[in-house]
Amino acid sequence: MVVGEITQQRNLIIIGGGPGGYSAAIRGAQLGLSVTLIEQADLGGVCLNKGCIPSKVFTHAASKRAEISHLADLGIGSGDDTFNLSKLLSYKDEVISGLRSGVENLCKANKIEVIQGKATFLAVNKIGVENGHQFDIFEFDQVILATGSKPVMPKWVTNKGKRVLLSHNIFSLEEIPEHLIVYGQDYIALEVASSFAALGSKVTILFDKESEQVFDESIFKELNRLFKRRK
């Protein structure tokens, strides 16, 4: 491993290149700070690359397919009602790539240094960034941690094989499952459930009654009513 000989100075270091991280980086640069943004995976974070945006693409496709199924009721022939998952996956990748390029261009326009690597604190005002065989050291005035979150696997899930999916990888499936069990009740879980149901899966939603409700009681009741109608 090659260790940088010079400790580099920055006003602001941001660890995490998701919406929180790159938005803070842009604002810091606009205020005249020297900013370095560190992301160990793809710029845009989980939201853009594996979570929110892929979920919205699938939800949009599902809503369009649901519209087609009702055209016959209006006397409109819908032709061959087929669904091509590979085309949807290609479209999803195009959307993600375009949005990621937009974030990259925003960072360039604001003169933000973007480093792909893993950051480790060496002192209260110093970090090391590992990128392959390179290890660079930075001292900073301020640091923002925007590392995001990751799904928590329920304790009762003991078999973590290929059939157990997370919100981070379900939108990369190469075929629509015949039966899908969704555990959770936040908006991502409900988007997964509704989109895969519209695309052909038989979907069952599971959640703990004891867990805190994500939505207001009236919204929860309305969602429950709508999902029951779609059985």
Question: What role is predicted for each listed range?
Answer:
Residues V2-R10, I26-L33, I38-I176, K209-Q213, ...:
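Glycine-rich flavin
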Residues I6-G18, I176-D186:
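Beta1/beta-strand and adjacent pyrophosphate-binding region of the FAD-binding site
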Residues N11-L37, L190-A198:
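N-terminal Rossmann-like FAD-binding beta1-loop-alpha1 element of flavoenzymes
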Residues I13, G128, K202-T204:
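A generic structural signal for ordered secondary structure
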Residues G18-Y22, D42-L43, P151, F171, ...:
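Residue-level detector of alpha-helix initiation sites
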Residues R163, E174-E210, V214-F215:
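Rossmann-like NAD(P)H-binding beta-loop-alpha module
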